[in-house]
């Protein structure tokens, strides 16, 4: 059986990638005619969801940056083994809300941790599994945070409470990743209206599937 494809959705907080992912599922099923598995990080499976609660709890204000990184990576490992790899081995298209690039952008560019160490730890945890395609939803930090503040249905987490400068560093980190990985990462202007963003994301995935 042909291995499935892994497509990751990345972006700073408030970029709208989660909403776009949800909107894409029926469109992709109609266009590609294959089983689609959607999941998220941190989380996706029971153990990783418990780790997610630890990481994002607003009361955990004293969490060390390296502790945060290692918790994300632990959740990623369990998620990969328990959900992502079985789906890929079954030939499914797997759409993941955040993956390795989030660690590089948030804990690397955002927190200032060593990027080479982050990449090595992720390589170790994932056995070298990389996305086939990454959609990066770019939005100015001010707009992203304004969207979060206006979204009454969103549960505020610990990272949402960080200062603007951290979110700006995260965005810069993502933009650097996009420049360094032009064959894998497709940058999408997420400041557009939702329909335009969904259309751009759909076109990128279909183009990749036909390559």
Swiss-Prot record:
Enzyme Commission number(s) from the entry: 2.7.4.9
Binding site for ATP: 11-18
Catalytic reaction list: dTMP + ATP = dTDP + ADP
A GO BP annotation: dTDP biosynthetic process
InterPro entries per UniProt: P-loop_NTPase (IPR027417), Thymidylate_kin-like_dom (IPR039430), Thymidylate_kin_CS (IPR018095), Thymidylate_kinase (IPR018094)
CC terms in the record's Gene Ontology section: cytosol
Alphabetically ordered keywords of this record: ATP-binding, Kinase, Nucleotide biosynthesis, Nucleotide-binding, Transferase
Biological function: Phosphorylation of dTMP to form dTDP in both de novo and salvage pathways of dTTP synthesis.
Record's protein name: Thymidylate kinase
Species of provenance: Streptococcus equi subsp. equi (strain 4047)
């Amino acid at each position: 059986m042909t291995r499935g494809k892994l497509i990751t959705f990345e972006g700073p907080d408030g970029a709208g990638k989660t909403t776009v992912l949800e909107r894409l599922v029926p469109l992709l099923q109609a266009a590609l005619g294959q089983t689609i598995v959607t999941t998220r990080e941190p989380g996706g499976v029971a153990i990783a969801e418990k780790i997610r609660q630890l990481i994002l709890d607003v009361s955990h204000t004293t969490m060390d940056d390296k502790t945060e990184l290692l918790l994300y990576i632990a959740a990623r490992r369990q998620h990969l083994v328990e959900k992502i790899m079985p789906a890929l081995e079954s030939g499914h298209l797997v759409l993941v809300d955040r993956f390795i690039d989030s660690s590089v952008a948030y804990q690397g560019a955002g927190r200032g941790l060593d990027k080479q160490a982050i990449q090595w730890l992720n390589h170790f945890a994932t056995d070298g599994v990389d996305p086939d395609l990454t959609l990066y939803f770019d939005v100015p930090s001010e707009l992203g945070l304004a969207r979060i503040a206006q979204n009454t249905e969103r549960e505020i987490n610990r990272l949402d409470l960080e200062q603007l400068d951290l979110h700006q560093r995260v965005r810069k980190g993502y933009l650097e990743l996009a420049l360094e990985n032009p064959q894998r990462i497709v940058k999408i202007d997420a400041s557009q209206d939702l329909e335009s963003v969904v259309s751009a994301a759909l076109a990128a995935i279909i183009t990749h599937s036909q390559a």
